[in-house]
Amino acid sequence: MAIRRRRRTFHRRKVCRFCVDSELKIDYKDSKTLRYFVTERGKIVPRRISGNCAKHQRELTLAVKRARQIALLPHTTIHNV
């Protein structure tokens, strides 16, 4: 019986873009930047996928919620009835 060996794939660790570039700021009024961190279904992308650090993920979550509150970002996608 042949033994199958799995090759380990190397996954590059994602780096927080807000820590790397101090010019970038998280602002609830900047919906263009916030859309990158929201799925097409309207959910906030988790840290392990987006690569943000804990501090900036908390700020980002707060900014997305504020943008939703004043209708800069939708809560969900458009539903076809």
Curated annotation (Swiss-Prot):
<dbReference type="InterPro" id="IPR001648">
    <property type="entry name" value="Ribosomal_bS18"/>
</dbReference>
<keyword id="KW-0694">RNA-binding</keyword>
<dbReference type="GO" id="GO:0070181">
    <property type="term" value="F:small ribosomal subunit rRNA binding"/>
</dbReference>
<dbReference type="GO" id="GO:0006412">
    <property type="term" value="P:translation"/>
</dbReference>
<protein>
    <recommendedName>
        <fullName>Small ribosomal subunit protein bS18</fullName>
    </recommendedName>
</protein>
<keyword id="KW-0689">Ribosomal protein</keyword>
<dbReference type="GO" id="GO:0022627">
    <property type="term" value="C:cytosolic small ribosomal subunit"/>
</dbReference>
<dbReference type="GO" id="GO:0003735">
    <property type="term" value="F:structural constituent of ribosome"/>
</dbReference>
<keyword id="KW-0687">Ribonucleoprotein</keyword>
<keyword id="KW-0699">rRNA-binding</keyword>
<comment type="function">
    <text>Binds as a heterodimer with protein bS6 to the central domain of the 16S rRNA, where it helps stabilize the platform of the 30S subunit.</text>
</comment>
<comment type="subunit">
    <text>Part of the 30S ribosomal subunit. Forms a tight heterodimer with protein bS6.</text>
</comment>
<dbReference type="Pfam" id="PF01084">
    <property type="entry name" value="Ribosomal_S18"/>
</dbReference>
<comment type="similarity">
    <text>Belongs to the bacterial ribosomal protein bS18 family.</text>
</comment>
<dbReference type="InterPro" id="IPR018275">
    <property type="entry name" value="Ribosomal_bS18_CS"/>
</dbReference>
<dbReference type="InterPro" id="IPR036870">
    <property type="entry name" value="Ribosomal_bS18_sf"/>
</dbReference>
